[in-house]
Amino acid sequence: MILQLLVPVDGALPGPVLTEIAALYSTNHAFFELSGDFPDPDRITVEQVAASLADELAHDGAEILLARSAGRLVGLAATLDRNPAAAPGDDDPWIGLLLIDATAHREGYGRAVATLVEDRFRAAGRTGVQIAVLDNNPKGLAFWQSQGYSPVRRAKDRELGRDCTVLRKPLDTA
C-alpha cells in the first residue's frame, strides 16, 4: 500500500482522481448519515466532494493522502499539521478524516492507512497524533481505541458543533 499526496493542479483537483474519490465517498453512505456532512448520503456528487476537499485543503498545514493498493483507491486520510483551535502547547497533528472504501471494510486497510499516516508524522519528529470521533460513531471510537488511541477530552467538532471524543496516541520516535 502507498500513500499519495493529493495535489491540486492550477487550483483544481484532477477530474479523474476526483471521480475516484467521489466513488470512495459514495460507498460510505452509512458514515455520512452519522456525520451529516452531505445533504443526501445516498447521492453524494463529485461537486460536493470537490467542495468538501477544497474546504479541508483551505486550512494551513492540511493534506489529503490517497491510499492505493495494487493501483486501486482504497482509502483517504485528511490530516492537519496542527489543530487551529488547539490550546497553547498542544502541537500535535490531527487526522481529520480516515475513510476506507466500505466494500473493503474489515480487510485491514484502515489499520494500514492509520499506521502509514502515523509513520509520516513520526518521521517528521512529531510525538503524538490526535483525532476527534463523533459521539454517534461507536464503531469509529472502537477502531481508534484498538489502534492505541486514548480519550483525552470531550469537545465539539469545528465544522458543525457535533459532540466528539478527542483521542490521542503517543508516537514513539525510537
What are these regions (language model features)?
Residues 2-105, 114-116, 120, 170-172:
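Acetyl-CoA-dependent GNAT
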Residues 108:
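Glycine-rich phosphate-binding loop
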Residues 111:
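Residues forming the Rossmann-fold NAD(P)(H) cofactor-binding site
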Residues 121-132:
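Conserved GNAT acetyl-CoA-binding A-motif
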Residues 130-134, 145, 150-166:
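Conserved catalytic-core motifs of GNAT/GCN5-like acyltransferases
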